């Protein structure tokens, strides 16, 4: 009776036990027509995102002066880089740690640059301090202290602005450092995705990443609540919504799907074990989502500057024309005298 029952059970695949990501050729060999079409469409969407960003970066570089153009280019690069790294991770599953490291670096810089853009759109640091110098800063905002309504309001001065900038700069610095440490420990087997035991470094690195992330988001939230009424005509609410959308999808969505993969909710389907299949699904979702974010960013940031640049170019041409007329008139007056 027992041998017959054993014959009816499906054979156990060792891939599900090792939980090791497959090589790229193993993925490609197991693709059906639907999988091939999906790979082609997602790769095409990634290429379109890259081309849209390059065109937008060229436009910003030519039309907008420094340092505003570099800040906006960095912000627009975030979604494109997440889509690109996700595409590489989809094609090469074993590169997930390295693609996640690259995406996290760009995300950290994106959050810091977005806060700098809020100050820059107010006219710079001096204009920002003169505009909001008499305003009290509300620090009981999400995601860190939204429930602590009893927190006092702070005066806005150079020290306050420096602390807010430090809140995002620490994330731009520490997040790449922590992810680099995770990659190094992963090669040694000390860092394992989904392993929450205290003996492994995974849980401690994840706690550090979580603290730095929440602190940076808190600083940006405080700054946004302060300037949003003054920057409504500059589409700042839409830009902030897209920024939040990018952060939530690249962080919260990824964490939830990875937890589902490590707990077995997303099951093993050879050649992909559970955690690798979860990363595989998340990468495909991120490509589609970041494609939409790239297109929306182009609309928001491009439309904002078209009319302004047109007026600036007209003013520059008028000033140049007036200067040339003045120089020509002066030359005609001075010519006979010099002779």
From Swiss-Prot:
Keyword tags: Cell membrane, Endoplasmic reticulum, Glycoprotein, Lipid transport, Membrane, Transmembrane, Transmembrane helix, Transport
Main location: membrane
Membrane-protein topology: Multi-pass membrane protein
Keyword Acetylation: no
Residue spans, topological domain Cytoplasmic: 54-70, 119-165, 224-254, 302-339
Subunit structure: Interacts with slc51b. The Ost-alpha/Ost-beta complex is a heterodimer composed of alpha (slc51a) and beta (slc51b) subunit.
Protein name stated in the entry: Organic solute transporter subunit alpha
Biological source species: Xenopus tropicalis (Western clawed frog)
Function (record text): Essential component of the Ost-alpha/Ost-beta complex, a heterodimer that acts as the intestinal basolateral transporter responsible for the translocation of bile acids (such as taurocholate), steroids (such as estrone sulfate), and eicosanoids (such as prostaglandin E2).
Catalysed transformations (reactions): taurocholate(out) = taurocholate(in); prostaglandin E2(out) = prostaglandin E2(in); estrone 3-sulfate(out) = estrone 3-sulfate(in); dehydroepiandrosterone 3-sulfate(out) = dehydroepiandrosterone 3-sulfate(in)
GO molecular function: protein heterodimerization activity; protein homodimerization activity
Family: Belongs to the OST-alpha family.
Residues the record marks as carrying a glycan: 6, 188, 195
Name of encoding gene: slc51a
Cellular compartment(s): Cell membrane; Endoplasmic reticulum membrane
Any Pfam family matching the protein: Solute_trans_a
InterPro entries membership: Ostalpha/TMEM184C
Superkingdom assignment: Eukaryota
SMART domains in the cross-refs: Solute_trans_a (SM01417)
């Amino acid at each position: 009776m027992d041998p017959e029952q054993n014959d009816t059970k499906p054979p156990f695949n060792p891939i599900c036990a090792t939980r090791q990501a497959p090589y790229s050729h193993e993925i490609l060999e197991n693709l059906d027509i639907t999988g091939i079409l999906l790979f082609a469409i997602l790769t095409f969407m990634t290429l379109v995102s890259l081309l849209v960003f390059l065109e937008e970066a060229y436009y910003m570089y030519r039309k907008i002066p420094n340092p505003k153009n570099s800040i906006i280019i960095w912000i627009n690069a975030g979604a494109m880089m997440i889509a690109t790294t996700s595409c590489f991770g989809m094609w090469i599953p074993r590169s997930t740690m390295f693609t996640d490291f690259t995406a996290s670096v760009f995300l950290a810089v994106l959050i810091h640059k977005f806060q700098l853009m809020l100050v820059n759109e107010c006219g710079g640091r001096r204009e920002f301090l003169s505009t909001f110098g008499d305003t009290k800063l509300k620090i009981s905002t999400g995601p860190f202290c939204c429930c602590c309504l009893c927190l006092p309001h702070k005066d806005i001065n150079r020290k306050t602005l420096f602390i807010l900038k430090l809140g995002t700069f620490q994330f731009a610095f520490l997040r790449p450092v922590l992810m680099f440490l995770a990659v190094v420990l992963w090669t040694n087997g000390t860092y394992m995705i989904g392993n929450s035991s205290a003996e492994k470094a995974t849980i401690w690195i994840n706690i550090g990443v979580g603290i730095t992330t929440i602190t940076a988001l808190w600083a940006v939230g405080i700054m946004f609540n302060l300037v949003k009424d003054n920057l409504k005509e500059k589409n700042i609410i839409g830009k902030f919504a897209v920024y939040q959308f990018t952060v939530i999808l690249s962080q919260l969505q990824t964490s939830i799907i990875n937890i589902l993969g490590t707990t077995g909710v997303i099951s093993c389907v050879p050649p992909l074990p559970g955690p690798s299949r979860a990363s595989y699904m998340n990468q495909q979702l991120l490509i589609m989502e970041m494609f939409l974010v790239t297109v929306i960013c182009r609309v928001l940031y491009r439309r904002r500057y078209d009319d302004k640049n047109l007026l600036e170019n007209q003013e520059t041409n008028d000033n140049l024309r007036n200067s040339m007329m003045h120089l020509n008139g002066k030359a005609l007056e001075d010519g006979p005298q010099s002779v």
